[in-house]
């Protein structure tokens, strides 16, 4: 594999796109073309990227561009990383365009967290199809080093080995080699847990619902971020795309655990997508004095209410015995 000096990140204005751009620029010391729908969004993403790795100096390595520059950026790049929304048709369109300009020996990859790598590889002309891989970095990548690497049946396995070495030795990723199955490895497990928690919140809405389930499945199970809070952090639109993909393309004993609850779809329809949109399953309110107040969506009433700090008898007994 050629030395990775120039990288293009497609969809760089998104949270993950900006964060991944920062990883390539900081750890990889690469020049990164940040491709977004418009240049102003790309410029703002470059600033966020610097902050995500606590290194404003990398902004000098980040070049904001828009999609009108995609062809020339891809031609100049040693690696092209697509980080667009988790939508198969959108990704097919983008990879078809990338494939027209990808140079021989360069690497193309998708940051998809679970869509078919084989299907996306088929967007590329035969002469460069072997250069395409799945590289799913976990969010936020500066703090979570886990990275899923996935080949397609068309992949050049020598190039795959070189890419794995680059991810490990240069970008300091902890690489998990994954099969090309819906949601790969991490999200097949993680989104099963999150979606089941959302289902339980609906089932136990009379007990409190969302924050009730999070209180049970958070610290008591060793999680620093409870599962429903995690879904809010990921984005409800992304959550839906992943669980819908798993539901449509699998049929195992946990199939029904990937059915999206109706109240989550309702929030998505209202553009309440979670932390990135300012409200979703949770909503943080700031008053004029700067004090913060966490609200939670009440499934039964369809409104936001104050988050409840639950106490559970088993937790009180545990504290008693631990003293």
Stretches with model-predicted labels:
Residues 1-323:
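N-terminal glycine-rich phosphate-binding loop for ADP-containing cofactors
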